[in-house]
C-alpha cells in the first residue's frame, strides 16, 4: 500500500509508465536507427504514445506538495534521456530531475545513491515502474514501489 504522506521523492520510469506505447513492433534494425534519427532531428519519436491523466494528477499533486520527482529510465545514450525528459515536460507539464541509467538493474543503484545524497530514508522514495523486477528490487531494499496501474487506481480512489 502506498504511503504518500511519507514520500519525499517520486521516481518515474518512462516507457509504459509515463509514456504509454501503442506500437509494439520491433525496431527495423538492431540499432533502432529510425528512432535515433527522429531523436537526433528533434522529431516526435513517441507520436503513437499517450500520457495518462490520473498519473498527471499525482504528478501535479507532488509539485503542489513540494515533493521532488525524477525520471529513472533505462537509456543507451544521453539524447534518449533528454528526449524522454522533454516528452514528459511537453505532455505532463512537469520538469523531472534526470536520473536515467544505463540498465534496468542500475535503477536500484541510483535510488540508493539518491537516498544517501539527499538524506532520504529508503521508504521516503517511491519508484513507479511497469517492470515487476524493478518494483521487487526496490521493495526488497526498503523503497516504496508501485506499478502505473496501482498509481492510477490510487488516484481514482483517493484523489478526485
PLM regions: where:
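Active-site neighborhood of HAD-like aspartate-dependent phosphohydrolases
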Residues: 1-50, 154
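Short catalytic/ligand-binding loop motif for oxyanion handling, primarily in non-cytosolic enzymes
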Residues: 18-22, 78-82, 107, 133-137, ...
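Short glycine/proline-centered loop/turn elements that form peptide/ligand docking sites
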Residues: 26-29, 111, 131-137, 147-158
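Short, acidic loop-to-helix structural element flanking the phosphoryl-transfer center
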Residues: 29-71, 78-82, 108-109
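Structural beta-sheet core signal
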Residues: 71-73, 127
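A short, structured active-site edge motif that brings together acidic residues
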Residues: 74-77, 85, 91-110
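Short, structured coil segments at secondary-structure junctions
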Residues: 94-95, 140-143
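Conserved Lys-Pro-Asp/Glu-containing loop-to-beta segment of HAD-superfamily phosphomonoesterases
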Residues: 107-133
Amino acid at each position: 500500500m502506498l504511503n504518500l504522506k511519507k514520500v519525499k521523492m517520486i521516481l518515474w520510469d518512462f516507457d509504459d509508465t509515463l509514456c504509454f506505447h501503442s506500437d509494439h513492433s520491433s525496431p527495423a534494425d538492431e540499432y533502432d536507427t529510425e528512432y535515433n534519427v527522429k531523436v537526433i532531428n528533434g522529431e516526435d519519436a513517441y507520436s503513437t504514445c499517450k500520457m495518462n491523466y490520473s498519473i498527471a494528477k499525482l504528478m501535479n499533486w507532488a509539485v503542489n506538495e513540494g515533493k521532488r520527482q525524477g525520471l529513472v529510465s533505462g537509456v543507451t545514450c544521453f539524447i534518449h534521456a533528454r528526449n524522454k525528459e522533454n516528452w514528459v515536460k511537453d505532455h505532463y507539464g512537469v520538469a523531472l530531475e534526470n536520473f536515467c541509467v544505463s540498465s534496468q538493474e542500475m535503477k536500484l543503484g541510483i535510488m540508493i545513491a539518491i537516498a544517501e545524497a539527499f538524506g532520504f530514508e529508503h521508504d521516503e522514495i517511491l519508484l513507479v515502474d511497469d517492470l515487476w523486477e524493478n518494483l521487487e528490487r526496490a521493495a526488497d531494499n526498503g523503497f516504496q514501489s508501485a506499478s502505473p496501474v496501482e498509481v492510477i487506481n490510487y488516484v481514482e480512489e483517493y484523489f478526485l
